[in-house]
């Protein structure tokens, strides 16, 4: 059966589609409390903006377009994410088919994406903008390899579309087209692709896609870059100078190993001696891919040396190293050895990973009393809503964080949910509110309902004065009853008379 599934991209895609349907069903069955990225999407889906803060807006635009038609729900948050992630796998398979002669190897390369922790597990757990980045990276690889093999106006435009989408999905995507451009230069047979007239409309298309956000960026550079720079520099952990450079280079090495180790070990274990014999094989396409990965990683070395980055995360390497599995299978195919035994050993890895990932996604929520680590999805928002609205319903909700705001938006799909000073000054909706307004926040820790000075100050600046601060504490969902999560809240009357 597994051999039939991996016979072509079509059969493998059907198998993958069934897997993603199971992921959707599992998310719908689990508590409808949103994790941080989901909550941000829920909150941001009220607005169509050129920029939203530290993350580029592509995923937000997609989510806004869907929510504006269907309304907010758990389905609307889960289904688009899984479709985009499925698209990542599909275009990766199509990219593999451009460089691999064997249709079976291309299908297996596509399915093998699940062995990359950042793709198989982390993208399903909590990430959204990274899912868009993965999709754009696969789309770019497909257009890039198609252009090298058989250039058409369509393949060039595909590169332009992927580049535009990638740049407004995650800023680190910019490394990929730069690395691809440099990687092609030494290959005489493909160098002409870089001076082809069809590259111009591709560039124009990419610019048009990026333009709305690019016009927003200069006036909002601080809000767009500060959180990322803070995570990259980790100043509280690394002193300036050589110690910071050393920590940054070490974190880069650890991130690379964390990204590539598992699939390499699995493929090496399956193909055994054939894998090590294949490492010496080469071809023009192999050399291009090698240069792409090396140039991308050198760009991160430059970030460490010249931007002071000391904390490189694995997911930042997605556009640099996603091509790894195509590279490994291309090495095996180019070695011109019998791969049948290795393929038979490797095929079962994919369904095993599917079962393991679904089990992790389930057990991390329902088994927290055994694990001891409580997730945001275990916060009992439905219980809070039942308690808070037993006697009255809000006409407006003012939240202290995006986590609170997004979850309240899901619970009250017809009620505006706002955060002070986003997207503009104060809370203008308060002045027009006729009826009870719910102000709700959380503290620094799970059992701390203390209102933060910053949020309290923003409320005062917005003309909202809290008559009484109250606390609501409920046990975590699926917990042992001993651990709880607390929120603070206050009811005020709207400003409209």
Swiss-Prot record:
Belongs to the glycosyltransferase 83 family. Its EC number is 2.4.1.-. GO terms for biological process: lipopolysaccharide biosynthetic process; lipopolysaccharide core region biosynthetic process. One of its GO terms (molecular function) is hexosyltransferase activity. Keywords: Cell inner membrane, Cell membrane, Glycosyltransferase, Lipopolysaccharide biosynthesis, Membrane, Transferase, Transmembrane, Transmembrane helix. It comes from the Bacteria. Pathway: Bacterial outer membrane biogenesis; LPS core biosynthesis. It is an enzyme of class 2 (transferase). InterPro entries: LipidA_mod_glycosyltrf_83 (IPR050297), RgtA/B/C-like (IPR038731). It is a multi-pass membrane protein. This is Lipopolysaccharide core galacturonosyltransferase RgtC. It is found in: Cell inner membrane. It comes from Rhizobium johnstonii (strain DSM 114642 / LMG 32736 / 3841). Pfam families: PMT_2 (PF13231). Disruption phenotype: Cells lacking this gene produce a normal lipid A structure with GalA at the 4'-position but a modified LPS core structure as this gene deletion results in elimination of the addition of GalA to the Man residue, but does not affect the addition of GalA to the 4- and 5-positions of outer Kdo. The mutant cells are also more resistant to the polycationic antimicrobial peptide PmxB. Involved in the modification of the lipopolysaccharide (LPS) inner core. Catalyzes the transfer of a galacturonic acid (GalA) residue to the 4-position of mannose residue of the LPS inner core, using dodecaprenyl phosphate-GalA as the donor substrate. Seems to act after the other GalA transferases RgtA and RgtB. GO terms for cellular component: plasma membrane.
């Amino acid at each position: 059966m597994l051999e039939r599934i991996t016979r072509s991209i079509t059969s493998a895609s059907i198998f993958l589609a069934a897997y993603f349907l199971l992921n959707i069903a599992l998310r719908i069955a689990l508590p409808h409390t949103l994790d941080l990225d989901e909550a941000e999407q829920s909150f941001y889906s009220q607005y169509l903006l050129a920029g939203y803060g530290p993350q580029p807006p592509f995923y937000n635009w997609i989510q806004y377009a869907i929510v504006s038609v269907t309304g907010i729900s758990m389905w609307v948050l889960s289904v688009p994410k899984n479709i985009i992630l499925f698209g990542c796998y599909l275009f990766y398979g199509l990219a593999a088919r451009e460089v691999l002669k064997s249709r079976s190897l291309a299908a297996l390369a596509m399915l093998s994406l699940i062995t990359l922790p950042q793709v198989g597990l982390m993208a399903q757990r909590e990430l959204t903008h990274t899912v868009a980045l993965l999709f754009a990276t696969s789309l770019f690889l497909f257009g890039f390899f198609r252009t090298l093999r058989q250039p058409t106006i369509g393949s060039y435009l595909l590169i332009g579309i992927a580049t535009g989408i990638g740049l407004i999905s995650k800023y680190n995507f910019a490394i990929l087209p730069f690395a691809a451009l440099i990687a092609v230069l030494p290959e005489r047979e493909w160098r002409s692709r870089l001076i082809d007239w069809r590259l111009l409309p591709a560039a124009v298309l990419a610019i048009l896609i990026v333009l709305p956000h690019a016009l927003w960026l200069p006036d909002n550079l601080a809000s767009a870059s500060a959180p990322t720079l803070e995570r990259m520099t980790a100043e509280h952990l690394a002193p300036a100078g050589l110690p910071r450079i050393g920590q940054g280079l070490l974190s880069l090495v650890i991130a690379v190993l964390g990204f590539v180790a598992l699939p390499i070990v699995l493929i090496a274990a399956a193909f055994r001696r054939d894998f090590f014999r294949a490492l010496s094989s080469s071809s023009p396409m192999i050399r291009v891919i090698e240069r792409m990965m090396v140039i991308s990683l050198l760009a991160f070395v430059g970030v460490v040396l010249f931007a002071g980055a000391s904390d490189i995360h694995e997911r930042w390497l997605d556009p640099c190293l996603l091509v790894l599995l195509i590279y490994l299978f291309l090495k095996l195919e180019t070695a011109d050895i019998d791969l049948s035994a290795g393929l038979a050993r490797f095929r079962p890895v994919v369904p095993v990973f599917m079962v393991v990932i679904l089990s992790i996604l389930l057990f991390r929520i329902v088994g927290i009393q055994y694990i001891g680590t409580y997730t945001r999805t275990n916060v009992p928002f439905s219980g809070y809503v039942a308690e808070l609205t037993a006697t009255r319903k809000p006409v407006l909700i003012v939240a202290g964080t995006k986590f609170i705001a997004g979850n309240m938006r899901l619970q009250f799909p017809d009620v505006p949910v706002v955060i002070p000073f986003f997207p503009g000054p104060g809370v203008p909706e308060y002045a027009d509110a006729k009826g009870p307004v719910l102000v709700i926040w959380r503290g620094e820790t799970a059992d701390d309902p203390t209102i933060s000075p910053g949020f309290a100050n923003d409320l005062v600046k917005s003309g909202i004065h809290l008559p009484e601060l109250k606390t609501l504490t409920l046990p975590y969902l699926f917990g042992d009853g001993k651990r709880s999560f607390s929120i603070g809240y206050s009811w005020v009357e709207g400003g409209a008379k």
